Amino acid sequence: MVIASVLRSYPQLQAAMFARNIAAGERQAAAGEFDLKLKGSSDNGPAGFYETYRHAIGLDQPLYSGGQAFAGYRIGRGDFQPWYQERQTNSGGEFKAGVRVPLLQNVDIDERRAALWAAQYGRQLAEPDIQAQRIQLVQEATYAYWEWIAAGESYRITDRVLHLAEDRGDRIRSQVEAGLIDPPELTDNRRLIAERRAKLADAQRKLEQTAIKLSLFWRDDSGNPMIPTADQLSAIALPPQPDSNHPMDTTDIEAALRQRPEITAFSWQQKILQVELSQAENLTLPEFDAMLTAAQDVGEPSSSKRDKSQLEIEAGLFLEVPIQRRKALGKMAAVEGKLAMLAAKQELVKDKIAVDVQAAQVGLQRSMEQVVQTQMSVELSEELAARERQNLDAGLSDLLKVTLREQYAAEAAQKLVDALLLYHRAEADLRAALGADAVVQE
């Protein structure tokens, strides 16, 4: 009930889930580098010896395989300088299309694709953070729930020993009036009642405070905190009978390494760095591109030579080589260093996960044994207290001995509550160490 409330409406977990929106937005922004671009220009010279009017519009499409394709239309009218005759077109203008493709650098990867792939991996990287938040919050909510249950048990114990003293008051009064015991016995019992009422008030305080703390995790469908009431308390659960000879389950460590989000996060971080390394290696190659264009003027010829009326096809090669390649080599060295650092951190985290699981297993096992022994102590203490009360009624004991026996029984009962709380906390620790709550089961 409490865990379902946390997974449904806890604000911190909801805030973590918005990381998905952030990552999705970054991925969309990276994909925007492949958007079709519309370009246009208008360049006019209405005054002067040469009056020229030039207008152009075109489309530019970056290709996912590298390079780009382009197409456009332009028209140039007026009296052009002799050295700018290529700006002039036939009366209907010029249509042009072409493609530029990489032959060495940017064939398998380029800056656009590297950014897109890194953003895609970054979107996956948001999930481990959400899972880590979920594990932590489930653990904290489990702690808060069992602390509230334990506070309720402590209140019941304190209330029970108070009623024992109150019920005994009438019997002691009648015995004093009959002259069987001295009057200070009645006064001492009144003192004991006052003391136990004070302890009950303190137990009530702890119960109310733990209920308020639990309301942080227990929320209604609208996400508003709900403070649980005392009538919603249930008895604190007893653990199964422990097996002191039960060996450490190594499969738990294997399961934790599969389920813990830290390992998944390292995997996606490594993929992002591998993309960066591939792009750095790509930059070590010469920039060698091929381009093919075709252009066709339409309309009335702009000159008697009709030199713009034929279909024009151009093919070209473009080469650019950074001699030292320091930018590429420097990036490669930096990324390789990051990969080595990430691998070292991953090994340490794996060791810590194994330690977490083993420590949680030990904690759960020993707390189970502690519960069993404490439960035995409670039974024996209650038996002694009941016998001492019988002796008091028979005149074979005094109030001091009864008080001590009841105090020992109450302390034993409280120790059992503490042991049970420790057990349930250890159980939550083991689930957290295993990463069992990383993914919600639909």
Regions found by a protein language model. Name each.
Residues 1-54, 99-120, 131-134, 145, ...:
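Bacterial Sec-pathway N-terminal export signals of envelope proteins
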Residues 3, 13-30, 133-158, 167, ...:
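Amphipathic alpha-helical coiled-coil segments
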Residues 38-52, 66-90, 94, 98-132, ...:
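Small/polar (Gly/Ser/Thr/Ala-rich) solvent-exposed segments
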Residues 52-54, 94, 143, 312-314, ...:
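Transmembrane beta-barrel architecture of outer-membrane proteins
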Residues 58, 98, 276-279, 318-320:
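Outer-membrane beta-barrel architecture
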Residues 182, 186, 201-252, 287, ...:
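Short, solvent-exposed, mixed-charge loop/turn linkers that connect secondary-structure elements
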Residues 188, 195-198, 202, 411-414, ...:
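Heptad-repeat coiled-coil alpha-helices that serve as dimer/oligomer scaffolding interfaces
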